[in-house]
């Protein structure tokens, strides 16, 4: 019995190569793997992109079959291959690096070759027997990388969008719940890291929920507006060369049906092939969310600082020992990690922006970097938001006595008294308190500027944290 061959020979315009016998990709994918050893992140790292590529190929095959250009047996085999990819099979065969030259041709050929070889086996042939079903002639029929790839990127983003929104919404709800829990905890608000006026810890956390809620609403509206127009059918530059006149409409209709997304043909296929503006805007929205998350995490780190020599108004749940040399130290590792994710997303947006600007004439060859950065930003943000909610926000507790102590000893409390004792008295009390180290309330009582009943009324939390003004007595 002869040993099973460990490789097969495939050829292209540059010559021949040995392809591993068990590989469903082919020679062009192998060349790309050998050429682009850059990020170390293969296409399979982003399953939604792989699924989207398979959906594009299925839609193209359906349209070509309906138009009479693709035989039934080939259509059936391609359909089976695409269905398996959509289910999650064979994703490990998508081995090309996310960063690549060629405007995404390596990605497109990785998909074409994998689908072709799965289909060949379904037809009873062996991998590489392309005379029966060809990656270019059949799987890539009526397509160019320049319309199939950007369409798949848009679709992949849409397919993963709901998961991102769900993570953001869950984080918002966690902040909102803390807003309710801490509604009665009076504390000092701060501006420029200096004491300002009283507020509640609940108001502070509610504001976190509100600012992220704004981004949730915008992201919900933005993706359907930006990403549903596709250039599938435009082929090389948007003119539709080598495609049946009826292909574009049918292919987009089939892709919408297969994916469940409200896809529609771009109004100007040449513009849609060359312009990356939709990705720039969508990435900018992801950056905005990252900026907000980072600012919130800055606040959480400050508010939990100490525990003895910092603000120490809240306790973050301890996640791990914080130092190899300082016993007992616990660091705010979860907010710190989210800060770093935010910096990465901000950097991704800049790289994507430069790639979008780097296009020339009818095509932007930098689209692989655009795809890599935007999928990476989504993955990082989703994971960071889940981590922040699960390992930090839900376990935060308030140091109620510490919050009250800081309010009582803050010079900022004089602002609440200003309408009742006047600006000059308030300024003098504040100055004396600072110089002597005594409390504002102690000095007000000593000088009998207000009676106890009035003072107690002013100092009620509900009266200090919302608009309220009683005229000065004559």
Swiss-Prot record:
| Top-tier EC class | lyase
Entry GO MF terms = aspartate ammonia-lyase activity; phenylalanine ammonia-lyase activity
| Biological classification of the source | Bacteria, Pseudomonadati, Pseudomonadota, Gammaproteobacteria, Pseudomonadales
Known EC number(s)? 4.3.1.1
Q: How is it used?
A: Catalytic efficiency establishes PA-AspA as an efficient enzyme for the production of the industrially important substances L-aspartate and cinnamic acid. Catalytic efficiency can be enhanced through protein engineering and enzyme immobilization which can improve the production ratio.
Q: Which residues bind L-aspartate?
A: 105, 144-146, 191, 324, 329
Q: Which organism is it from?
A: Pseudomonas aeruginosa (strain ATCC 15692 / DSM 22644 / CIP 104116 / JCM 14847 / LMG 12228 / 1C / PRS 101 / PAO1)
Record's keyword annotation contains Flavoprotein: no
- Catalytic site positions: 323 (proton acceptor)
Q: Where is this region: SS loop?
A: 322-331
Temperature-activity profile: Optimum temperature is 35 degrees Celsius. Retains 80% activity at 15 degrees Celsius. Shows very high thermal stability, and retains about 56% of its activity after 7 days of incubation at 35 degrees Celsius.
Which InterPro entries does the record cross-reference, listed alphabetically? ApsA, Aspartate_Ammonia-Lyase, Fumarase/histidase_N, Fumarase_C_C, Fumarate_lyase_CS, Fumarate_lyase_fam, Fumarate_lyase_N, L-Aspartase-like
Q: State what protein this is by name.
A: Aspartate ammonia-lyase
Source domain of life is Bacteria
* Notes on activation and inhibition: Does not require any divalent metal ion for activation of catalysis, but the activity is slightly increased in the presence of Mg(2+), Mn(2+), Ca(2+) or Co(2+).
